[in-house]
């Protein structure tokens, strides 16, 4: 529907009434009011005029006198709508009852025809005059959801009309934005642009029905912390069903310190009654802002026309305050909040991007691989002893260097999802709950020497290159855009050196491994100890100069989807972050409880925390190539092996004494890899058992005893195998070589008795 300007009820004065004359007229025209003591009190209204009727100073009714231009068919439609809603027992008590039999004409003081209706009065306080709470907001969402559900099955030809307050049809408002100037005009232009993107282009995808169209805070009645009434059906039209929720929110969020909680309360309960789909979610916030636009535009125009009617501007100040607050919150972030509330994936393509990142072979961001260096965890949380004051405190460097010395490292890691107390400025106060701050770290900090070169871990394009030169901000900042298929994600590099501005420019394409900057010093990086703030971003939320490095704790589930853990790219083992073990305590317990015969390798023992594929990872997050353990045949933490073992153990785990298929299947598969002569299998549990059994078979088959072994060999821990192992019998505590054991030199061309410089070195070993 397109709105076309025409002479409407908004263009003429509302009825002008003589109260005494009206009371006499009421007694004549309504039988239930005859012979009664009547008093009337005018209510606030916009285009018509309404009164409370008091009968004998007790019983109350609502008297509605229409605008002279109001058409009777619209009023009859309203009555049909009210009766339809009251036919639902769960809604009946919330909807005013009609007390007029017919709609009667009344002439105002200007002799203009107006129509009169009488409805029941619902006792309570207006939502706009009530301090809201969870219970009120929940009941409001529930009632609106029920109304939307009920109205799905109702239609009326008179509801199909253009209406100036319809937030889904505000093309008319564009020209009126010019009556504003400065920041207000910019806010309205931005809102209109969002309307075109999120509403106008989405209208064909929205569900339509008859809507109340004005569930504002003075059409909602509250009693005992519950909504008890929904008033005024004069704005009801056929429009996108989601309009009612959007309009309700545009008023419920006014003068509200906790926008998030109100959104959550109302939308959650509405969604339980009337399930919101993804297209409606995409339009909801913009529809809410569009209604606020209508409010401020109409208020200014009406105030000029009727300067004495303060009711016409009743919501203007609050609407502007909310528009200014919402303007600071990216609309996509608000959409993500609604998606989470309604149970949808926060970012619909999140999993595709994360799967791509998990599989991609990223390059190093420094000249070296972080996994090949000792690293120290630098906790900057609220209870951390590191931060005794401001982050630029000179003693911080001393405390960090002390940790580096203890860990024999020169690299510090500041944690993702860490709650920090250093973000104290007013710009860190949450717009969604002013009682909370943005204090959860959304990146990983890598503390390293200033001047250290940085390199792109993946191909990209520079889209942000900005010096955010504010205290405790990023300082020189770089953001790269990365594309695959139809998706994009971004990496942010903060606290860099200004030198990058001389060598890089916006739009420059960067190849994996290409230089992208240096670590900045504290005079240029926002007054921080030299480090890199590294962050992954799936949606820039409209930012083109900067991006938040910290988010609200109560919104972390959303921030986590927008800025997932940067360790997806860095790939420092998880055990490094969760390592709470004290090396000295671990070593002490080992020596106390485990025999010294089970020796520990290396003078300074390696404290291993994790293993994956061919690598071990120690407590410093440093990796080691495992060439010792037999597990390297299939790799550590092999998910396929783990899954197969788990599946089998949940079904059956027994020995060779019983008949079952698994052992046969495995035997056939294993034998298929061997020569045909090897056609029988012995199953044992360890290498010692296998070697001992093979030795006994050989003895039995040959009736011989003599054995050739290599020097320094170890074959197992059974008595028979220790006698065959020079590593054991020739070592301290060993019993020496048996006469049937013959030790051969290990043919080592580099360190052996005969070396490759001797052309006959191989023959020497044979001889």
Model-found features: residue ranges?
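Acidic, glycine-rich catalytic/binding loops that coordinate metals and/or anionic ligands
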Residues: 350, 359-382, 386, 508-514, ...
């Amino acid at each position: 529907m397109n709105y076309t300007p025409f002479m409407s009820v908004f263009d003429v004065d509302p009825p002008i009434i003589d109260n005494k004359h009206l009371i006499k007229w009421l007694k004549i025209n309504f039988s239930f009011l005859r012979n009664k003591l009547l008093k009337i009190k005018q209510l606030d209204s916009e285009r018509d005029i309404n009164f409370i009727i008091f009968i004998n100073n007790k019983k109350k009714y609502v008297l509605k006198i229409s605008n002279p231009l109001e058409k009777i068919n619209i009023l009859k439609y309203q009555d049909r709508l009210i009766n339809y809603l009251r036919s639902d027992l769960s809604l009946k008590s919330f909807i005013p009852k009609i007390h007029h039999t017919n709609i009667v004409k009344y002439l105002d003081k200007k002799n203009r025809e107006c129509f009169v209706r009488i409805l029941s009065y619902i006792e309570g306080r207006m939502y706009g005059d009530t301090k809201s709470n969870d219970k009120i907001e929940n009941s409001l969402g529930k009632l609106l959801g029920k109304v939307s559900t009920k109205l799905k099955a109702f239609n009326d030809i008179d509801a199909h009309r253009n209406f100036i307050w319809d937030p889904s049809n505000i093309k008319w408002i564009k020209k009126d934005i010019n009556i504003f100037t400065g920041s207000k005009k910019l806010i309205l232009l931005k809102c209109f642009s969002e309307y075109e993107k999120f509403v106008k282009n989405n209208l064909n995808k929205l569900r339509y029905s008859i809507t109340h169209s004005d569930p504002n805070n003075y059409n909602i009645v509250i009693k005992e912390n519950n909504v008890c009434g929904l008033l005024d059906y004069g704005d009801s039209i056929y429009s996108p069903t989601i309009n009612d929720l959007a309009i309700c929110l545009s008023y419920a969020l006014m003068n509200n310190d906790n926008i998030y909680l109100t959104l959550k309360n109302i939308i959650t309960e509405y969604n339980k009654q009337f399930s919101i789909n993804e297209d409606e979610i995409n339009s909801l916030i913009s529809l809410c802002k569009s209604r606020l636009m209508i409010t401020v535009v109409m208020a200014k125009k009406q105030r000029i026309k009727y300067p004495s009617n303060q009711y016409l501007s009743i919501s203007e100040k609050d609407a502007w305050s909310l528009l200014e607050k919402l303007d600071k919150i990216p609309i996509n972030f608000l959409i993500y909040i609604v998606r989470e509330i309604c149970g949808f994936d926060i970012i619909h393509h999140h999993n595709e991007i994360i799967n791509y990142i998990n599989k991609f072979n990223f390059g190093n961001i420094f000249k070296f691989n972080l996994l090949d260096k000792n690293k120290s965890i630098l906790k900057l949380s609220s209870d951390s002893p590191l931060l005794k004051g401001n982050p630029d405190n000179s003693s911080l460097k001393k405390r960090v260097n002390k940790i580096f010395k203890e860990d024999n490292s020169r690299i510090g890691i500041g944690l993702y999802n860490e709650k920090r107390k250093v973000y104290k400025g007013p710009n860190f106060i949450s717009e969604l709950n002013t009682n909370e701050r943005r204090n959860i770290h959304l990146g990983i900090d890598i503390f390293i020497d200033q001047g250290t070169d940085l390199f792109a871990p993946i191909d990209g394009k520079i889209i942000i290159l900005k010096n955010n030169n504010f205290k405790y901000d990023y300082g020189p900042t770089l953001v790269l855009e990365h594309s695959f298929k139809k998706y994009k994600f971004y990496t942010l590099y903060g606290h860099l050196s200004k030198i990058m501005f001389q060598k890089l420019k916006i739009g420059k394409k960067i190849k994996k491994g290409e230089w992208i900057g240096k670590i900045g010093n504290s005079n240029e990086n926002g007054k921080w100890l030299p480090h890199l703030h590294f962050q992954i971003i799936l949606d820039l939320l409209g930012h083109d100069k900067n991006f938040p490095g910290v988010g609200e704790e109560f919104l972390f589930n959303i921030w986590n989807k927008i800025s997932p853990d940067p360790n997806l790219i860095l790939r420092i083992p998880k055990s490094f972050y969760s390592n709470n073990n004290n090396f000295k305590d671990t070593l002490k317990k080992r020596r106390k409880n485990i025999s010294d015969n089970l020796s520990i390798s290396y003078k300074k023992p390696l404290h291993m925390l994790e293993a994956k594929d061919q690598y071990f990872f120690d407590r410093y997050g440093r990796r080691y190539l495992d060439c010792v353990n037999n597990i390297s045949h299939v790799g550590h933490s092999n998910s396929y092996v783990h899954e197969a073992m788990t599946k089998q153990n949940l079904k059956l785990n027994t020995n060779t004494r019983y008949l079952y298929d698994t052992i046969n299947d495995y035997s056939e598969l294993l034998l298929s890899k061997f020569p045909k002569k090897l056609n029988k299998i012995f199953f044992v549990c360890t290498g010692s058992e296998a070697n001992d059994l093979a030795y006994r078979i050989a003895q039995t088959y040959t009736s011989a005893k003599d054995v050739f072994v290599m020097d320094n060999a170890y074959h197992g821990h059974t008595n028979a195998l220790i006698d065959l192992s020079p590593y054991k019998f020739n070592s301290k505590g060993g019993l020496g070589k048996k006469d049937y054991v013959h030790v051969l030199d290990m043919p080592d061309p580099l360190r052996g008795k005969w070396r490759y410089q001797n052309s006959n070195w191989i023959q020497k070993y044979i001889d």
